[in-house]
């Protein structure tokens, strides 16, 4: 029996004997580490095992409690591999982004949803309305930390999920990427180590390159997410200052971390005094009944800088994002003043006007339904036209699919061939510091599906079959 299993059995016996009653709060992870002498992750896995058995439950920002009734849950398993890598992003990413801008190219490589899914007429009316009433003072009023009404509106949306965030700690930014970059800059210095997922969003790698930071890439599973055992190993071996992670609808894999894993993640980083920069731009694009909580929901020690935006769920062109910066909010404001000065005043005012109409949630419900339908349609189309050797990794949120080619094929080569036919895909090496994931590519399912898209998938299937035939002759 392993250590975490012995600890779980010990706690289970204590619950059975009445030492801990239903509803009782168990010792925190840190308290259990101190009393048992075991490692943080050993204790974390013991609690996770008990939770999977339905014997305890995790409550955001509160801790672990003895459950009144057993609830069956699954426990994540992961590999134990870690590597440290210097960051060097080549021009390949920029070439792919340029291809995505060409309207003659089928945009399966795009990171954005179909703009026709957004309520652009209503947003344009809001923009026209505020342009009529804007004054010279509007620019001053919308300097960092940003428009007060917009910050209050965002704070209220946190409150709807039971998360207390003061409007005063929210900084409005020019999209989520600025929020993430400013957050990273606020808690690191050149040469510091930063943890990223492997694979991860290429914007994170570009930010690390620009700020001359060093990356630790942690193995990340397409279903279960980041390997917490490997993360703990990295935190023990390297002086890590920050973690840049996606916890909901991760790009490019598409997974959403379980509530149990989010709780363990925050507790682990808090234990090691490492800041989590949470990239949560896809959190509204869930397909289930309830919106998944961000890791921020388990933050009681100012560990998490939560970053999001309206770009992926409402209006990309406005470039309005934010960070719930906690004690770092003032430093983030200062950094913003020294770089972009402030976020567009008319865009902030237009968003305030639109959000006041209460149409936002109705739009989100419609958007989620359309994205789910398009993802299902794309998946079925890919199954019909791609060779059986291609594996399609599917998650029930967001609008990305992660495709895996057979061993001998290279997605970069497929991408180059596809571009000759005006089809773009996002090869896996865009999402790694080392150029790994060469057999994988990300596929955007959010665009309108018609004859053009159907023929493009057929062409991809033909190209893959040609590559397989060529390899078999070697």
Question: What residues fall within each predicted segment?
Answer:
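N-terminal basic, amphipathic alpha-helical segments
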Residues: 1-128, 333, 337-344, 365, ...
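N-terminal small-domain helix-loop-helix segment of the aminotransferase-like
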Residues: 82-175, 182, 356, 424, ...
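Conserved core of the PLP fold type I
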Residues: 137-272, 284-298, 371, 461, ...
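Hydrophobic residues in well-ordered beta-strands that form the structural core
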Residues: 196, 217, 276-278, 351, ...
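Short, conserved active-site loop motifs that form the nucleotide-linked donor/cofactor pocket
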Residues: 274, 304, 390, 423
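Conserved glycine-rich beta-strand-loop-beta hairpin in the small C-terminal domain of fold type I
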Residues: 369-379, 390-404
């Amino acid at each position: 029996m392993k250590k975490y299993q012995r600890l779980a059995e010990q706690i289970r016996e204590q619950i059975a004997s009445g030492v801990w009653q239903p509803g009782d709060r168990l010792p925190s992870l840190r308290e259990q580490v101190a009393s048992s002498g075991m490692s943080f992750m050993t204790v974390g896995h013991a609690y996770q095992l008990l939770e999977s058995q339905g014997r305890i439950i995790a409550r955001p920002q509160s801790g672990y409690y003895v459950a009144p009734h057993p609830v069956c849950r699954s426990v994540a398993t992961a590999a134990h591999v870690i590597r440290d890598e210097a960051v060097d992003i080549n021009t390949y990413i920029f070439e792919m982004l340029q291809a995505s801008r060409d309207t003659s190219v089928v945009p399966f490589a795009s990171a954005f949803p179909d703009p026709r899914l957004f309520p652009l007429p209503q947003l344009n009316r809001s923009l026209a309305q505020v342009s009529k009433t804007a004054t010279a003072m509007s620019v001053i009023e919308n300097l960092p930390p940003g428009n007060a009404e917009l910050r209050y509106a965002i704070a209220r949306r946190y409150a709807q999920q039971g998360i207390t965030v003061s409007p005063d700690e929210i900084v409005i930014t020019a999209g989520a990427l600025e929020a993430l970059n400013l957050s990273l800059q606020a808690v690191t210095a050149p040469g510091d180590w930063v943890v990223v997922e492997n694979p991860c969003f290429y914007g994170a790698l570009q930010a690390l390159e620009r700020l001359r930071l060093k990356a630790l890439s942690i193995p990340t599973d397409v279903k279960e997410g980041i390997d917490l055992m490997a993360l703990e190993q990295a935190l023990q071996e390297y002086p890590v200052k920050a973690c840049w992670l996606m916890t909901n609808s991760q790009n490019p894999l598409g997974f959403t971390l379980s509530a149990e894993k989010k709780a363990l993640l925050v507790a682990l980083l808090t234990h090691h005094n490492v800041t989590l920069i949470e990239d949560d731009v896809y959190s509204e694009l869930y397909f289930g009944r309830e919106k998944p909580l961000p890791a921020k929901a388990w933050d009681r020690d100012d560990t998490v800088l939560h970053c999001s935006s309206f770009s992926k769920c409402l209006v990309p062109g406005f470039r309005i994002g934010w960070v719930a910066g906690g004690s770092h909010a003032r430093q983030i404001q200062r950094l913003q003043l020294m770089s972009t000065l402030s976020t567009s005043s008319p865009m902030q005012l237009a968003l305030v006007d639109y959000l006041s109409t209460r149409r936002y949630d109705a739009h989100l419900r419609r958007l989620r339904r359309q994205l789910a339908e398009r993802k299902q349609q794309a998946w079925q189309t890919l199954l019909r036209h791609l060779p059986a050797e291609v594996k399609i990794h599917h998650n029930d949120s967001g609008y990305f699919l992660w495709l895996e080619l057979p061993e001998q094929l290279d997605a970069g080569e497929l991408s180059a061939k596809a571009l000759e036919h005006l089809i773009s895909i996002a090869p896996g090496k865009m999402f790694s510091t080392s150029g790994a994931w060469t057999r994988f590519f990300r596929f955007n399912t959010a665009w309108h599906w018609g004859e053009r898209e159907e023929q493009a998938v057929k062409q991809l299937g033909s190209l893959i079959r040609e590559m397989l035939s060529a390899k078999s002759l070697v």
